Amino acid sequence: MNRIVFALGLALTSALTLFTPALSAAPAPEAWEIWDKADNSSEAVIDHSLWQAVLDSHLKPSADGINRFAYKALAAEGADTLKRYLAAMAKIDPRNYNAAEQQAYWINVYNAVTVNEVLKYPSKNSILRMGERFFSVGPWDDKVFEVAGEELTLNDIEHRILRPIFKDHRVHYAVNCASIGCPNLGAVAFSGAELETQLANQERDYLNHPRGLTFDKKGRLQLSQIYEWYGTDFAEDEKALVAHLAERHATLGDKLKTYTGDVNYDYDWDLNSAE
């Protein structure tokens, strides 16, 4: 029996190793047309206070500049506030709001759903080991949220709504995949009124953190794999990407402008757990 269990575990580990490289090719943005509608005359505001309450009580900033989340504590409490938030968001048709409110809505929903997904797999130490299917490499293709009569996956929200409809590269700094390598889960819920400032802050913070951009001991440029997976969301090619980053980095701009070496990409998929 132990040999069978060991063999199954080995097979799963091998499968994860085999399929993880596929993550280097992210889904292309392809608009889900039914969501490409907005009432830009609307001044109505979506209430994200329940999500803010979850962030206030369970998001833990760390000295290393990485925000971690107390998943186990939230699960032990029953996650009632998170559940109520997602239930409230499921009753809203975001198309009745202006574009900024919609974008904030989808980012918050994505992040809240991701937290909820992590709670379903308390023994897993990486989101890559989560998901409903036997050989899942993450929960991104699971149906995890329903709104306006449509069932959505996390990939739907990111690649069929946020990226193609709003066309803002900074969404990659806003959505959080529950991993150390990911841009921080923001401490303040996104809102239409503050969206521009919030996205700018998320971009600045990640770009200027070593997990976003750094030079190794040999002087080689190392970037987050986000810039590899979604490179054309930022620039037309790698050279233009480095120039794009040079314009935005607080201290390394001049060094980046003259850099002509290879670019290495890295990402830490460990769970961003505070426990």
Model-derived segments and their meaning:
Residues 1-4:
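Positively charged n-region of N-terminal signal peptides that target proteins for export
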Residues 7-18:
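Bacterial N-terminal signal peptides
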Residues 19-26:
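Signal peptide processing junction and immediate N-terminal pro/mature segment
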Residues 26-275:
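Interaction/scaffold regions that mediate signaling and macromolecular assembly across diverse proteins
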